Amino acid sequence: MMILHLGAHLLFIGLIVCKANAGSSLRFTGSDEQWVAFPMWNACCESEMSFSVKTTHLNGLLVYFDDEGFCDFLELHVHVGKLRLCFSIFCAESTCVLSDVAINDNRWHSVSIMRNFRNTTLIVDDEVKWEEVKSKRRDMTVFSHLFLGGIPSELRSVSLQLTSKTVKDHTSFTGWIMDVKVNDSEPAIISSAGVHEDLCGSENTCLNGGVCSVVEDKPTCDCSQTGYQGKDCSEGLAHLMMLDRGMEEYVATFRGSEYFCYDLSLNPIQSSSDEITLSFRTLQRNGLMLHTGKIADYVNLALKNGAVSLVINLGSGAFEALVEPVNGKFNDNEWHDVKVLRNLRQHSGVGYAMVTISVDGILTTTGYTQEEYTMLGSDDFLYVGGSPSTADLPGSPVSNNFMGCLREVVYKNNDAELELSRLAYQGDPKLQIHGVVAFKCESVATLDAITFETPESFLTLPKWNAKKSGSISFDFRTTEPNGLLLFSCGRAKQHNKEAKSPVTLKVDFFAIEMLDGLLYLLLDMGSGTTKTLALNKKVNDGEWYHVDFQRDGKSGTISINSVRTPYLCPGDSELLDLDDPLYLGGVPESSSGTVFPTGAWSALLNYGYVGCVRDLFIDGRSVDVRRAAELQRAAGVKPSCGKEPSGKCVSEPCLNRGVCREGWSRYICDCTGTGFLGHSCERDATILSFDGSKFLKVQFSAAMHTEAEDVSLRFRSLRAYGVLMASTSTHTTDTLRLELEAGRVRLTVNLDCNRINCTTSKGPESLFAGQNLNDDEWHTVRVIRRGKSLKLSVDDLPTVDGEIPGDHTQLEFHNIETGIITGKRQLPTMPSNFIGHLQSLMFNGKPYIDLCKNGDIDYCQTNAPIGFKSIIADPVTFKSCSSYVTLPSLQAYYYMYLFFQFKTTSADGLILYNSGDGNDFIAVELVKGYLHYISDLGNGAHLIKGNSIKPLNDNHWHNVMISRDPNNLHTVRIDTKTTSQTTLGAKNLDLKGDLFVGGVPEQMYKDLPKLVHAKEGFQGCLASVDLNGRLPDLMTEALVCIGQIERGCEGPSSSCEEDSCANQGVCLQQWENFTCDCSMTTYAGPLCADPGSTYVFGRQGGVITYSWPPHDRPSTRVDRLALGFITLMEDATLVRVDSSAGLGDYLKLHIVKGNVVAVFNVGTYDINIEENGKLVNDGNYHIVRLTRSGGNATLQVDDLPVIERFPPGHIDSHRLGTGRLPYRRLVEESLPKNGRQLTIFNSQMTIRIGGWQKQQVSGFQGQMSGFYYNGLKVFSMAADGDPNVRMEGSVRLVGELQSSSTPHGGATVYQSSVTEISSTTSNTITITYSTPADEQQTTDELLVASAECPSDDEDIDPCEPSSGTLCCFVPPAGPTGPAISSFPGPAEVFRESNGTTGMVVGIVAGAALCILILLYAMYKYRNRDEGSYHVDESRNYICNSNGAALKEKNTADDDSGSKSKKNKNKEYYV
């Protein structure tokens, strides 16, 4: 088909009067230095601005305002000739609206922007579009001026002052703007640049091609070349275009289903020319007005998107002429005249047709050539106002009939004239009228289709008053299988079936829903629910379906595409009481007071409808759903219906292994088995850890009743027993419960019939799925119930189906519980508590774990820790080999399941033993560090050795599972290694007597079976003991408790290992455990694995300042600084430390062109150190570690190699070339005079984090975490309200930035901790901190932080450690040459002395006394045996780069032994 889209020229009839205020407008030239500033428009809530615009350019910025660099903004710009509006509130993802109206036609267009909280509406001429931003806050914050045409250059050059990231990339607007109004008033111009007042730029200054010019400051029109006259060239020969009409006009009203049909087949018409004339009036954008002809020869006249469309085919191809008005649309409810002329000429056997169409003087004329000469005419039906199937007509650009008024429809040619409107009015038999047509012009509302884009979108319509009878019809179209189309219900009423029955709530309701592609009618008038399948065919194939529901009393019909299905409601009631509104497309999420009936499955399952709806009629009256959506600002509801091409899943939009399926113009991600949530499975689902005492309980304020449930969850456990999830009722035994039983998932559904009049079922229905699910791997469970039907699936295994017996299908519950069932009084059995991890608990579409965590529901209780925690349940320590407890005999006759966790350093020991009748027994023991399981079922003892690569007495926790099934398959699993063995013979284990745990009485060891090697009991820790699904308390349930047994797991259970401290934290071995130094990690917590204090620095800039008290300002030779941050800024100051006024010492860490740069000056010149290997303004989390020792410094970003800086000629450079820095002399006077200013950072006064200062814009913007500087955790101090910390500008504290399990690339911000001890020497207070090792350097030397070491500066030998508690520092390996540890040992701090003379005397006296005591102590220690005070190397560890601990090496040289012994008595160690 060939289509020609033709332009139009304007022919005005009559006199057009210009506007009184059309004298001037603002002309924008498009220069970069162009803008107009109006006062701030307070567009936070409900407000409106409007203007008129004219342009010929494709792009340009029209409107802009924001909150000056923080979150909120609104921008309107011309984008490829159309208007595009984008806005954001509270840092939410920006939302954009794109108009379909082309405005670059050099014509005036009216534009309005309407703000309504989260909604913003863009109106261009008569087109209305709106969007809603997904923001937690609904008000928009505005600080800037209202800018039109562009923005000042000073704003473009400074990105921090512009909230929108793209506005500075837009070109300035070129064209005219006038009639600017804000809330119906004209704002005053504050300032402008590059904008001119254009007297000829206003609307309709000169019409019909007249040329405007300014004469004596007034616009003047030159009409000499137009054929018109008058002040504005509007006076033409209107009388020549007037039609002679009779005294009577024939008008008919069409409402969408009516049409005229004139049969031309009996008397075809042909001629060389013909003419079609008619007048129309409508509000509808689309609709067929007239059609005649078949596939190869037809004429089609219709309204298409508010313009008049003429499509003609004369046999050799089709073309389309589209006539549009200058402003607005033709569907403006005004009369418009249409004339179509066709003239045929023949030349050399070739026909030449001239087609002319005129609409209110807008003319389009086209020549059209045919291959063969044929006459014009038709022998087919001639349709007026519509047809039986408009979408199937050849060449029809629209699919629906006309709705509005048609007047004087006439077809005439050289031989005949058909006055079709008159023939219809007079009832001519040749013309058939379909439908009821009113022969007068009546108002007809437009019935545009709307699209529900999300399951959460819906419309609220007026209450449907249909007590005795009523009807509803509509069309719908979708490809999605589930959705609630219509729903309304009445008020809840008390209902008693029997005197003994409880009072329940009943509601009348009406619903039309789609489940699994089938359409159902649901109706309840108080006597019971009827559920009718409308059509035994799926209707989600993307085609339009017409639904017609008719009701008369308790009976009626529902039809789809004229296929009718009758229904009959049970009971005697014939009145339908609906008190709530009628909801279209879904129901509100928070329907307080609305009781959803149990039969409305889609409402209870939160299945909203996604697709299109049109032509809604209620009781024979049309409902303008498009207008209703506009008035309600309905989120997710858009006008029109367009199906986007399939293939949304081709780009794999579902993240993290989410399963994608096609929806209606959208993709749908099934995140059930992924551990993620969100539209695209992009958000981590919350994990809860359960140790047998933890639970989560969701409590509902009223009893919930359902007949359909969708339940899914993920779990991970080492135990074979434990309740995963259960719905429980306060009054009944109703439950839907998921639990682990013998390594399988068991689904139990019990519907209590005892308290209601129903057919009693045989009891709970149970289904089982999966096996060996206690493997400490994630498993996904799904449950689908629809009435009596049950489906249970685990992972990707086949689904297990079941059916509930009886006629009762209603489940009642008050709670949803996990981990522990608290209301056990209503349950016949006591399910075992759960030990493991749960996430992604979904019940009828609601993720309850995440709702509880985020505080989105207020009826949730939980004590389960959030996150994936290591689970050690109820640990007990057997402190000696002779300790044990006894429990009742193990019941393992047919099968057995045992689980426990243990940790020990002992290679041998009896863990479990239970004897029985005859030779029956079981025993579990450690033999040389390996686990043995011995059992005898009467046919002889069998030994199974556990599969482990190395001995298990490694002081780590190990998980042990031992099982025996009815077929005598014995399985032993240790951690992840499994061993299985099948025994023959007897299958029953008959145990008697007590079960011994941890050992047996001493006299019993010699009588144990031969295969049992144990000669003593187990020494160590046991936890999570599970005996066939029972979790005994070894302390309180023990029959006998012998020896030293304590709760918890103490002793040498915590020693430094490679992974003891996370995130490069430094492990410090203690006597019975270890601690982690997190100072330089930006993380916190006992293992450096917890989130720390995080601050957000906003776009306006902010700063956190720590100020030392004036009397306590430190001077340092060594500084250590660490922080983590996320930013997109290319240049910003992170932190600056300044000395007191006049000294000039400072240290600064900042970002320059995306690289981290450190600069400091301690008295001589600026020293720089820079990391150029990685850009840090990429929005990811980065950690920066900076150390300074005198003029030397190291810098490390993330895990990159450490960068070292040694200034040439520095005094310490020479010292580093021959040995280590003697970080011992802390008294400032002892430092060399020529190096004092180069090494000492004097009198530190302030720490400024964020870099922002008033009237400056170089501050940091983003998030910063875990700040640490010389023992100061400023962020934690700020959060605790420390009086020395002050915050200014846009700074706010946030909580957790990310998951603690994420590595640096994933960017989690953590806090740091430090241990400190202080001592006083002379007038200088010295604080020495425990220090971690740098990640890059290694050496065999030890650097011990000491408060005092009596050696001069040339002495570079280290002080030897004493026998006190030791924090060891190992300078890691670095490049050859001058070497300094990247993170020096102590942060040496000098405090200024402000004491009086009396204080000095006191200090001197005290010092003298200390010296005497010290000399005496040295004498005593000198004569002691050296082994009595040396460090116990077995309990002191050296921390390496990844947190591992290495045993201390002796670093003292042979020739320095005496000196070291002399000095070590005067050292203090951390």
From Swiss-Prot:
The keyword Kinase does not apply. The chain crosses the membrane at residues 1398-1418. Residues 23-1397 are extracellular. It is a single-pass type I membrane protein. GO terms for biological process: cell adhesion. Disulfide bonds join 200-212, 206-221, 223-233, 405-441, 612-641, 649-660, 654-669, 671-681, 1021-1049, 1056-1067, 1061-1076, 1078-1088. Neuronal cell surface protein that may be involved in cell recognition and cell adhesion. This is Neurexin-1b. The gene is nrxn1b.
